[in-house]
């Protein structure tokens, strides 16, 4: 950790910390107290120590927290490259006390970033789910978070998301053709402002691999598990399967029956006597109204969880949007070799790899209102060899999406985004991405 050690040797405290009225929730404070006291099992001693200093942050005692964290960092600096748990704990805590010079140095050292990494806060007015990425003519990289992330206790999610994205950013920074300029990086489920994004449907949102695909190295663990435990096609059940949470709420929680995922479950229940569906809600999220929770639990639509490793027991896997595109669910479903039945997005949402997918070849398209779901499942049952081939094609396209290939494919996309925000008229959309007609 060369650059970290250099900063520690200088032993200079931060001088530009922004202090806001503390709005840490009671739940977060209690969690920190229990972590620090060792009441919560499964955490390391370093987590307990760091939690003690984060408690000081919650009380506004940033300088005392910083001093303690620097002592911890000095003691553990030599093991940081090897111990991801210690690294993440300290990265989060240093971000919270705004030792951004050390945050940048830790990221540079861990990922071999080719130049200085400057992390900053600014009143950008862009919201917590975005950050601004600037590349100067001399190769300096500056990542600016909106100061709103400092006003409550959500800093852990912000720095973790940034950390998970960093291999992609470091890969681009190492390219000789890397552009200069500024671009916004959307880090929410759907893009908020034109720039780089994980999921959207507008032409000025440039799609890149998401913060699930990148840190998992293209879901490497899923690939390995499924490769070792591949289920022969003839041993799979001729049933359309889905499990998922109640994401995708667009209006009042009282209107939960209008949720697309709820409608899917109700359609499946209507045809349950056919024996063709195993579909249900496996978790309630984004629902805080106790009456709505009770209604859903009493609806008969909530079924037990099924581990993703067992999805391959079914010949047909339904894929449906939640808050946005299904992210890991689609790729993992394709990797099983089962035939994916993809409910077309009612909002025309897409991810970076959607241009690779051909309907009726890699997946079976289902209408957004799912009016054709039963007929298509029945058709697949009658045309078993075709269904098997769709599953094989889907697995092949997913297996080809290695982390190495997708990082490299992201390079022209990121370059296009930088060029677009310099001069929108000079930009050409990369590898076939075209503006949505919707």
Where are these regions (language model features)?
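Residue-level marker of positions within ordered structural domains that often coincide
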Residues: 1, 58, 245, 269, ...
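A ubiquitous short alpha-helical element
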Residues: 37-39, 361
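Catalytic binding pocket for nucleotide-activated donors in carbohydrate/polymer assembly enzymes
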Residues: 305-435
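C-terminal extracytoplasmic interaction modules
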Residues: 438
């Amino acid at each position: 950790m060369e650059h970290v050690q250099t900063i520690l040797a200088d032993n200079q405290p931060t001088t530009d910390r922004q202090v806001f009225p503390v709005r840490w929730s009671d739940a977060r404070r209690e969690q920190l107290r229990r972590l620090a006291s060792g009441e919560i099992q499964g955490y390391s001693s370093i987590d307990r120590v760091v939690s003690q200093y984060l408690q000081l942050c919650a009380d506004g005692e940033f300088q005392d927290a910083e001093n303690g964290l620097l002592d911890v960092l000095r003691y553990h600096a030599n093991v940081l490259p090897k111990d991801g748990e210690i690294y993440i704990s300290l990265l989060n805590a240093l971000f919270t006390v705004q030792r951004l010079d050390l945050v940048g140095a830790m990221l540079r050292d861990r990922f071999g970033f080719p130049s200085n990494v400057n992390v900053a806060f600014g009143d950008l007015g862009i919201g917590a789910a975005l950050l601004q990425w600037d590349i100067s003519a001399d190769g300096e990289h500056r990542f600016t978070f909106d100061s709103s992330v400092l006003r409550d206790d959500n800093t852990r999610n912000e720095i973790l998301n940034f950390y998970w994205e960093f291999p992609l950013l470091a890969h681009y920074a190492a390219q000789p053709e890397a552009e200069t300029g500024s671009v916004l990086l959307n880090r929410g489920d759907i893009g908020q402002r034109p720039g780089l994004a994980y999921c959207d449907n507008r032409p000025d949102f440039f799609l890149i691999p998401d913060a699930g695909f990148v840190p998992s190295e293209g879901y490497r663990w899923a690939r390995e598990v499924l490769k070792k435990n591949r289920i022969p096609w003839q041993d799979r059940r001729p049933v359309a399967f889905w499990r998922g949470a109640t994401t995708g709420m667009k209006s009042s929680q009282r209107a939960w029956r209008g949720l697309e995922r709820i409608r899917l479950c109700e359609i499946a229940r209507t045809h349950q006597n056919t024996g063709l569906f195993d579909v249900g809600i496996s978790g309630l999220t984004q629902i805080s109204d106790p009456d709505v929770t009770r209604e859903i639990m009493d609806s008969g639509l909530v079924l037990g969880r099924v581990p993703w490793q067992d999805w391959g027991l079914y010949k047909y896997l339904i894929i449906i949007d939640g808050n946005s595109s299904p992210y890991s669910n689609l790729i993992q479903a394709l990797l099983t070799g089962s035939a994916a039945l993809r409910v077309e997005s009612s909002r025309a949402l897409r991810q970076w790899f959607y241009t690779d997918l051909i309907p009726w070849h890699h997946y079976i398209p289902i209408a957004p209102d799912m009016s054709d779901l039963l007929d298509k499942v029945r058709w697949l049952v009658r045309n078993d060899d075709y269904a098997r081939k769709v599953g094989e094609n889907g697995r092949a396209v997913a297996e080809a999406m290695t982390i190495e290939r997708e990082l490299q494919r992201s390079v022209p996309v990121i370059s296009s985004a930088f060029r677009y925000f310099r001069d929108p008229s000079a930009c050409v959309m990369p590898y076939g991405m075209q503006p949505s007609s919707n």
